[in-house]
Amino acid sequence: MSKLLFLSLALWASRSPGYTETALVALSQPRVQCHASRYPVAVDCSWTPLQAPNSTRSTSFIATYRLGVATQQQSQPCLQRSPQASRCTIPDVHLFSTVPYMLNVTAVHPGGASSSLLAFVAERIIKPDPPEGVRLRTAGQRLQVLWHPPASWPFPDIFSLKYRLRYRRRGASHFRQVGPIEATTFTLRNSKPHAKYCIQVSAQDLTDYGKPSDWSLPGQVESAPHKP
């Protein structure tokens, strides 16, 4: 399939009402995906490595990107650790662009070369990593939950996150959810003394761009300080 046809498909997809950030790939090509867990510092992209048929040689990849679907726009290298790497990084994200990024991943193997294209808007693929350091403090019937923003989220004071909690008492079959919460602490009232709880936290961009993170690891109860 020619690059011109790929570009035509990408332009059509980006203008269609049901447009999502889905790779436009030739038959038997890897599906390329990108996410912005480090917004706005970078967008990270990855794809499934290919093994050329009847060959022991590994496939190498050339990854480039540009802002906009027009072919006359200048392409830049998507940063890879090596030609065989199956992931790359787009640095210095252009914020709130009205045109999509176009990522072109070309697989080069002994049988030839073929390309896959992915069109995306950076804000639509924001997905923070899970919050970190979730911990629990008990005080009678109150259970305080504390956590930190994901370390990979570079500017939490500027590009703020909001959080949701889910919790259940040991033995319960369903989680209850609380949120959204803009602080990094929340107190559950009327908790059962001495009961054990599974509590997890999820993060999302404050302005609802993209998707929520996966749930964090369950919170750990802090040890009471030793009295001298």
UniProtKB/Swiss-Prot annotation:
Keywords per UniProt: Cytokine, Glycoprotein, Repeat, Secreted, Signal
Domain Fibronectin type-III: 26-124, 127-224
Localisation: Secreted
GO biological process, alphabetically ordered: T cell proliferation
Signal peptide: 1-18
MF annotations from Gene Ontology: cytokine activity; cytokine receptor activity; interleukin-27 receptor binding
Highest taxon of the lineage: Eukaryota
Entry keyword annotation includes Repeat: yes
InterPro entries in the record: FN3_dom (IPR003961), FN3_IL27B_N (IPR056621), FN3_sf (IPR036116), Hematopoietin_rcpt_L_F3_CS (IPR003530), Ig-like_fold (IPR013783), IL11/IL27_subunit_beta (IPR053073)
Family: Belongs to the type I cytokine receptor family. Type 3 subfamily.
Quaternary structure note: Heterodimer with IL27/IL27A; not disulfide-linked. This heterodimer is known as interleukin IL-27. Heterodimer with IL12A; not disulfide-linked. This heterodimer is known as interleukin IL-35. Interacts with SQSTM1.
Function: Associates with IL27 to form the IL-27 interleukin, a heterodimeric cytokine which functions in innate immunity. IL-27 has pro- and anti-inflammatory properties, that can regulate T-helper cell development, suppress T-cell proliferation, stimulate cytotoxic T-cell activity, induce isotype switching in B-cells, and that has diverse effects on innate immune cells. Among its target cells are CD4 T-helper cells which can differentiate in type 1 effector cells (TH1), type 2 effector cells (TH2) and IL17 producing helper T-cells (TH17).
Protein name (Swiss-Prot/TrEMBL): Interleukin-27 subunit beta
Native species: Mus musculus
